[in-house]
Amino acid sequence: SNTCWGISNAYASPAGIDKGANTTQPEKRGNGTCARLDTRIETVKVLGCIDIEVCIAGTLFLGKVIEPAKNVNDPYSIISMGIPFSQKPKAIMLDLKAKVNPERKVLRATGFSKKKWFEGHDEPEVYVYLQKRWEDEKGNIYAKRIGTVRQRFDKSIPEWKNNYRIDIHYGDITNEPYFKSY
């Protein structure tokens, strides 16, 4: 495609079972279009008798998904994330709204074990990691994080927030007052 954006609508084929997910999709907004990201349970019936249920979250990122996904245990192994930057961005800006479940329960459903609820809170988040990457003469690839954006939303945002800005912080931010350990 002719875009820098990647989405999690991947075609997967774990254990020889073919399945497509559509948790990120276009949605009309005013005169344009935005990306709607959903989290939901996808079900696959195998040979008419085995139900496999997987919890899938919508994502939007810079990069692409390497398809088909053969292994759900390491999703980052099938994602090529990132695009080169030559300048020092100050922030990420977006229009957003969110529907966040107020319950303090999280569902784990991988498709290969029973669904399990545990204590926690499923929260949408925005994150950006700016890295300097290089390869040595032996082919080893290295990355050093130089900039970070990370924000979670623990409550619903029912109305659109336009031009929402999240600053990019450079250097070691672990001792800064705005640092969050998540």
Model-predicted regions and their roles:
Residues Q131-F179:
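Extracellular carbohydrate recognition and processing domains
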Residues K45-G48, D74-I83, Y164-Y178:
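Signal that preferentially marks extracellular ectodomain short beta-strand elements
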Residues R40, D95-E103, V126-E135:
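Short glycine-rich beta-strand segments
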Residues I52-I92, S156-I157:
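Extracellular/lumenal carbohydrate-interaction signature centered on repeated Trp-anchored short motifs
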Residues P84-M93, A98, P102-R104, H121:
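Extended extracellular/luminal ectodomain segments enriched in beta-structured repeat modules
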Residues L107-V126:
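Short coil-to-beta strand junction motifs in C2/discoidin
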Residues S1-V46:
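Extracellular glycan-recognition surfaces and repeat-rich motifs
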Residues A91-K97, L107, Y127-Y129, R165-H169:
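Residues within well-ordered beta-strands of beta-sheet-rich folds
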